[in-house]
Each structure stands twice: as structure tokens, then as C-alpha cells.
Amino acid sequence: MSARKRKFNSLKPLDTLNSSRASSPRSSASLPPKRYNTFRKDPKIVDHLNNASTKDFLPVLSMNSESKRQIELSDNDVDNNDEGEGVNSGCSDQDFEPLQSSPLKRHSSLKSTSNGLLFQMSNNLGNGSPEPAVASTSPNGSIISTKLNLNGQFSCVDSKTLRIYRHKAPCIMTFVSDHNHPKFSLYFQQSVIYNSQVNLLDDVELIILDKKNSFMAIILKDLKKVKMILDVNNSSININTNILIWSTASSASNKKIKSIKRFLLMSYSSSIKVEILDHKEQILERLKHLIHPISSSSPSLNMERAINSTKNAFDSLRLKKTKLSTNDDESPQIHTHFLSNKPHGLQSLTKRTRIASLGKKEHSISVPKSNISPSDFYNTNGTETLQSHAVSQLRRSNRFKDVSDPANSNSNSEFDDATTEFETPELFKPSLCYKFNDGSSYTITNQDFKCLFNKDWVNDSILDFFTKFYIESSIEKSIIKREQVHLMSSFFYTKLISNPADYYSNVKKWVNNTDLFSKKYVVIPINISYHWFSCIITNLDAILDFHQNKDKNDAINSDEISINNPLVNILTFDSLRQTHSREIDPIKEFLISYALDKYSIQLDKTQIKMKTCPVPQQPNMSDCGVHVILNIRKFFENPVETIDVWKNSKIKSKHFTAKMINKYFDKNERNSARKNLRHTLKLLQLNYISYLKKENLYEEVMQMEEKKSTNINNNENYDDDDEEIQIIENIDQSSKDNNAQLTSEPPCSRSSSISTTEREPTELHNSVVRQPTGEIITDNEDPVRAASPETASVSPPIRHNILKSSSPFISESANETEQEEFTSPYFGRPSLKTRAKQFEGVSSPIKNDQALSSTHDIMMPSPKPKRIYPSKKIPQLSSHVQSLSTDSMERQSSPNNTNIVISDTEQDSRLGVNSESKNTSGIVNRDDSDVNLIGSSLPNVAEKNHDNTQESNGNNDSLGKILQNVDKELNEKLVDIDDVAFSSPTRGIPRTSATSKGSNAQLLSNYGDENNQSQDSVWDEGRDNPILLEDEDP
């Protein structure tokens, strides 16, 4: 034998006995080096030699017939291209002479390289011969330690939800077989996946593989908590599982799984249970049967499956978009729920197929046969909240978080208002009267106390009380001083913005006795659109100090050391996290005006800064008031620290800021905030009751409470009755005479909502109206309204009794038709439409047909009448007015006369009227404009036009006295002259007579003094011309 050593690692054994080099060992020196005249070996050959060296020196295994049969089955499941793959295929041991000092040399094809085999197969396995191999096992019979690396996809099944969680790819499985036991570990990014080490003998109960060598499922004996890193956002989650799944994506890895399968079948077939199925779908079905054995399913189990199926469908919506990758069997890797309603649960390892067998027993969902009562259905204690539903968590929670986790449902219970039980408000009597140390007192009634139940809106009384209560508590603890803080009422901001023209004037009286710029903190609760938020104004005292020491600051600035003006900070906090820049602008305007008025400080708007401060967000739309109370309480527990937290929140990230704010403001304790506030009030009430009993005032206070509650109930019933009040108008017609009496009740004052453009037509002809300037205009000119200051008094509803006389030119049938067509001015056609179509003027007498043919309508724009006050001096009352009214009552109507009756007051009706009065006043009703015309006597038709002027001048003295007395009486009795009645004969030409008495005269119902009419004044210059009387709206 040659003295040269054999190289077993990378070179073939050399036959030095038969070679030429053996005869002349020294001849190698004369030969040229081979590196210059030979080619380098092919890398594949080098790799083949390197891999074959380990295999050749392994001992040959001897196995029984059963093991041989299983290996034959496993070899036959590969395609025909693998037929030459077998160990020792195409080679024989007889080709080489065995050496006593070395194992037998074994040749194998290139296809079998790099498979990491841990054992050597005998050449007689294929023919099933029991003859042992030529080379037996090594004396010690041990197996050399070997490691095998597989690249693929790792998944596991959650034991609770039966969901498959796929680890982020790629993962590496390291299979190791040593002298102890076979085991494997999983790696990701060169680090071991937590708790993924598995010992096959100790931990594994069953291993299932497919014949394609692309899929392997390992069922563990016990649960293991495995840390999975998911595809979405690299989020990690710990999963309790006993099913591990390994799949491959490349053909190269399949042969390594095949090697593991062979090793398990031949070496550990008795200690490890191994099953080989045809394809992956059968493995999945096998896993389903292992988890849920086939049995008669109860209705409750079917219902649970139905719920899980629904959740699985929504869970699939939350997954990241599917990524498809092709492999040998062209199956896309799709992550889906494990136990879904699809025939093949794991689409990540199989092809997409159409659902063809939904009617199978394992896929059908049976309807529970048990009857459920409505009370049990709607009043279950275990009802899950809306927040726990998968759809509700699409944006709010971790996508892969278990939605059926009871801890998760409890954590979000604050968002579920629908399932909260109704709270019965406790009776809070007597009302709490609490007086603080600064002298201010607050009262909390039973109605206020109810606001703290059932997530009701907190009213102003509760908010004002508790903000004051917690500020006083901080003062008592010496956290702040009383002179450093000022609390505004919750109505301050509402009053501030009541008139946008001048904000400061709206609340000037509220702050006259305050010194706001000496306060360090000014708290202003704000309510806008039924939402509470608050702001705290700081640094006002620094502004005042700066301007008071302005001379010193100027001296410092002259030495080239500048001192900037301090800034006023308005710290605004809203539990809905809204910004309120516009709402804070009125407060800025108020501070500027207040500083100028109170301290003569010119404050610029740029010196006032609003800062939005983060606070915990409210979970509903009703707890804003509670959050304002708690935020103010937390602020005054440590104002400096709270301001620092708000300053630092601008620097931190948004996520970190939310966690820091929620922790600082104790958001978790706000679920019981209403209960704590109620408890505080009950304790204060107990102290108050003990004080009342000590002073012997308890019984008296309770009686007052009962009386007050009784009055409130009565008022509520009264208000309910008032809601059904209707305006009813009655029209009484008399067939005996041609007179109609209308009774209506207009509202007490004209509504501001009535448009000023509304006009009521009045049909007059040649009517004469006196203007305030003394001029007389006809009806074809626009009358000038007399202006007078309006009074602020509001008159109660007044009952108007209006007499409408028959027109001398309208027949009885026509008058009746007009009365039937009459409707109220508030609900239909105005009453003036039903008046006489023509009133004879003073210019020329006309006949019936002429009067009817010459009628025309004149629009009188007087929606808001006003009185005329003629003079400052009120004349003395004359007896002419009294005799005029009484005489009108007793006079009988004459066929040739027209009776004109003025209804003033009840006193006028009782006093009587002088029948010798030469003239009577013609009054034309202006209805809803309340403008009355008091005309002079209507002349005889036979007289000429120029006689009218002479008669008017001759009666100036007598008529002037009458009008002066009317002026005084109208001012004293506060009456309105509303209507004019004309009594006309049925035949002949109309004329006036001072001595005639009309039995047909209709009197107007008197206005009572209790109606408290606004004053009327008469504009008079002693003339007998018509006078304009106007009523002023209250």
C-alpha cells in the first residue's frame, strides 16, 4: 500500500497499487504540475464528491419487511422522473474491491445530492430480499449527528378560535437528529421563534404528511404558547396552539420533507405516529375531524358554529390584501380562516376551487329547535357590545385581536349605551342650599339631581355648583389662593354673545365690581349648541403688572435690554376634541374692552393667544358636562403641573400624547363619575338635613317643598290646557234691522313676525285726512304717518265690539251677502271688504247709482299705527262730549238722517249726550290699522260746495271745544276708537240733523278700564275738519 494518506473528505480513494506512480514514486518530480495542463473539476462534481463522502461511510440499515413496504410506497408516490433517484440505483458493490481499513465506497446519482440523508440504504431494499447488505452496520450501531434546513411557511392554529395565524415569511425549519432524539426549531431573521422548539419523541402526538412532500402538520400533545409575527405592521401576538403547520413554496424543499418522512418511517415508526395522505385537502379534513369529532351536534353547538362562521366572514375582511405566489402545484397562498364554511379551509395551501358541496352535513347549519322566550332573548346578561363586533373594530382595534375575548368586550363596555340598564332617579328632598366660604350660595333641587342619572345632559346648576365646589376645595387645601381665581357663571358667555355689536356692553354690569386682571386664573364654562366645554384664562395678572411698571420697563429697554409684553393665554379644552377659535373671539374682544375701560390699558389682539389643550375624549354625546367638571377639578388639583403636561403634549407624538393625557386625567375612573357626583351631593344633603333638624326648621322646609311641588304640578296642568286654546270668532246677524255686530278677539300686541309689507285695503271715496303739518290731502295722495315714540307696555287681549251700520247706498240683500262673506282679518278676508262701497264726501251729493258706479278702492298703508299728540297742554273736559254720547243712545233714527255714534267708555254711555249739539262726528273705521277719522257733519245734498266752507268756519269755536274735551278724555281713560257706524235711511238723500233722534242707533260695546289700553291723543287745532287718530303698538 502506498504511504500516501487517503483523503476521505473531498477526494476519491486512490488505487496506488496498480497505478504507474506506484512503480516510481520519485518520478512525480520529473512530471509537470497538473495545475498547468488539466482543467479544473466541475463544481457539480466537487459538490457531489463532498456530499457523497458522508453518505458512503454511514452504516447500512437492516429493516423488516413492513418498513421496506412503507418505503416502497413512499418511493412510488413520486413521479417517474424520480425512479433513478433511489439509493444505490445503477451501481453495485462489486465494482470496487472492499478495503479492510475503510468502509465500502458507494456511488449515487447527482439527483440524490444535497438531501441531507441521515442514514444509508441497502441495495437490496428495492427487491425485498431479506439478505443483509454487504456492508453491515458499524460496531457501535450509532447514527451520525446531522442537521437539515428547510425554507418555507410556518402557520399555527389557535386552540380557542380555531383561526390560522400565518407567520411572516420566510421562515427556516432546522431539523436535527443526534444521539438523543430528533427535534426541529423554527427561525425568523436568524433568531429563534419564541417557544417553537419541538422534540419529536416527547412533544409530538401525530405527524401528517402528503405524498407530494409539500405539506406537513404536527399535532402536539400539550398546548404551547408561540409568538407569531404577522404580516400586517409586523405586529406580534402570542397564540396557544397544539397544531403546527409547515408548507413549502419551492420544489427543492419537497425532497427534504421526503427525507424527513423516510427517516421517521424507518427509524421511529414505533415511537412516533406518522400518517401519509394523498394531498393537502385530506390533511385539512383530517385536522377538522381531530378537533371536532363527528357526532350528533346539539342545537347550542350548531348555534356556536353559526356565530363562528359569521365572525370568520367578517374577519376575512380585515385581513391584508391577498398575495398570490405560484409553486409546483400552482396553488395560491391565501390566508383564510381555518374552520370556514368553505369545503377546503386552508386556501393558503390549495387551489381556489368553487364551492360545490355546501349541502354536506359538515357544512350545513341547523336551526335550533329550542324555543327562546322574548325576555330571555332581549335581557341576556352576556350580550356582547357593539364594540366587540368585528365590523365595529375595523378602524379602532388590532385587526388580529380576538373579537370574542370577554376581556375585550368588558374593556369597551363604556361605548355600549343600549345595553345599560335604566337607573331610577332617587328622590332628592329637601333641596340642598349650600353656602361657600366666600358668601356665595347655590341650590340643588330634585330636578337638578335627576340630571346625574341615565347619562342625561348636565344642566347649568350642577355644573356651576361642582366647579365652584372643587375650586373651593383647592383653596382650602392651600393649592391656590382665593384672590388668584375667579369663576364666571355658566350664563356669562351666553350673555356675552347676546348682542354681537358690542360684547363688552352686554356684560359690563356683570363685571363692574370685579378685578379680573388681578386674577391668575379666570374660569369660563361655555355652552354652545347644547354642548359644554370650558376655558381658563391665565396670565392676566402679568399684563397688569407689566403696564403698572411700564416706566421701569422703559428704563430697562433703554439700556438695550428688551422686555416683551406678556401674553394672555386662553386654555380651551373640549372633551369632543374640537377647536373653538371663532367661539373664543368674543372673549378676546371682551378682554380688550375691559382692559381699556377698567385699567386704561391698550391691549392688542395679538397679545391674546388661544391654546387647544387635550383632555380625555368622551365616549358618548351626553357626558360633556361631566367631563368639564372633572377637567376643572383636575386642573386645580395642581395647575402648574397641568399646564406643563399640556405644553409637553405638543412635543410628543399623537399616540403617546393620548395615552399620557388619559393617564393623567384618570380616564378609567370617569365611568363612575356620575355616581361619585351623586354621592357627594347626598353627603352634603345629609349635613344640611342635620343642620335643619338642629335648628328646628326641617318640617317647615319640607312643607315648603311639598307646596312648591304642588304648585308646579298645577302650573304644568294649566299650561297643558293653554296649549289647546283656539281663536273663535262669532258673527251674529240680525234680520230685523240691517245692522251686524262683530265680536272678535285679536292678540294683545302685534307680533314682530308680521311683515310690515302686509296691507289691508280700505275702500273710501273722497275721504279727507289732515296731515301733521296742517295741510289737507285727498285720498288719492299718500297720507303721511304721524310719528311718536313707542311705549314698552304690553296690553292684555282686548275684546272689540264693532258696530257696522248699513250703508245708504247698499241694499239689504247686498248687506246680508257681505256679512256672509265676512271672515276674520287673522284667518281670511278682512272686514273692510264687507264695508259700504261708498261713503258720501263733503264735496258733492250723488245718488245711489252714481255712488255705486264711482266707487273705487284706496290702499291705506298703515300696518303699525301711531298716535298723534297735538299739544303738550291737555284741555279741560267739556260737557259736549258727555251730552253727545248720551243723546246718541236716546235718539230715534229719522228716515232722512244718518246717526253717527261714537262709543268711548262705559262712563260715556252713563253720562248722556246733549241733543242740541249742532254737529256729530263721522268716524270711519280703519280696522287693524286702528286709524279713525272723526269727520265734521255731513252736509245736506241740496247745499252747495261753498256753503260747506262757510259752515265749517262758523263752527270752529264750538267744534274746537268738543275736540279738546275729547283729547283729554281719551288720554285719561286710555281708550281706542276702533270703528265707525253709519245709520242710513232706506230712501232719500242723506243729510245730517243735530236735533233728530234715531231709534235705530246701535251702540258699540264699551271698552273696560281693565283692558289698560294705551293712551290716545287727538291732534287738534280748533277746526271742524276730520282729525287723524292713531294707536301706537304696545
Curated annotation (Swiss-Prot):
Any one cellular-component term (Gene Ontology): chromatin
Q: Which cysteines are joined by disulfide bonds?
A: none
As stated in the Swiss-Prot or TrEMBL entry, residues carrying the post-translational modification Phosphoserine are S788, S903, S983, S984
Q: Which GO terms describe its molecular function?
A: cysteine-type peptidase activity; deSUMOylase activity; transcription elongation factor activity
Please indicate which superkingdom the organism of origin belongs to: Eukaryota
| Broad EC category | hydrolase
The record's Gene Ontology biological-process terms are: chromosome condensation; mitotic spindle assembly checkpoint signaling; plasmid maintenance; protein desumoylation; proteolysis
| Comp. bias regions, Acidic residues | 74-85
Residue ranges for the region (Disordered) are 1-42, 71-110, 388-419, 731-800, 841-960, 983-1034
Q: Which Gene3D superfamilies match?
A: Adenoviral Proteinase, Chain A
Comp. bias intervals (Low complexity): 19-33, 743-756
Q: What is its EC number?
A: 3.4.22.-
Pfam families (alphabetical): Peptidase_C48 (PF02902)
Q: Where is the composition biased (Polar residues)?
A: 845-856, 876-904, 912-923, 992-1017
List UniProt keywords, sorted A-Z. Answer: Hydrolase, Phosphoprotein, Protease, Thiol protease
The entry assigns this protein to a family as follows:
Belongs to the peptidase C48 family.
Function, as annotated, reads: Insertion mutation in SMT4 confers temperature and benomyl sensitivity; high copy suppressor of a temperature sensitive mutation in MIF2.
Q: What else is known?
A: Present with 450 molecules/cell in log phase SD medium.
Q: What is this protein called?
A: Ubiquitin-like-specific protease 2
Q: Please tell me the species this chain comes from.
A: Saccharomyces cerevisiae (strain ATCC 204508 / S288c)
